[in-house]
């Protein structure tokens, strides 16, 4: 991790803070924007306590996992439910489940790719170059039990292909970060 750390610290935290500031600016004084972490600080519980103490009673919770998975998004809503069980005067809470094909999300991905192409050159797809969309994998068992994660990852890539005018052979869907001996979603990025 030392090689990816920035002067601001964790890249995830630095990006999350930047997103919070951008959303705060975008919404102006229409809403209070707060950053909460599921596995870190500031914790979801401490942020909800702070919002409550400031008089806020309505919360829109947006987990920053674009594709829903029980192992990610559901843990946020589970933590929220556990928090609400401990309160007598409950907050009114809405959650965003996922946003795999949200136009603004797809546009942000496409612009990031196009910016990279402008800086480093577009791949030579005619010569066999590939663009790989690599998602964190989940155990195959979770998929078999009905977890929609894989289909939402594929939906993201299909929308990105359409936006970038790429074929299935030019923009591939792969999965990474497997561990243990169980079967995981594939194809594996490392084998692609």
Language model features: what each stretch is:
Residues 1-192:
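Active-site-proximal alpha-helix that buttresses catalytic centers in soluble enzyme cores
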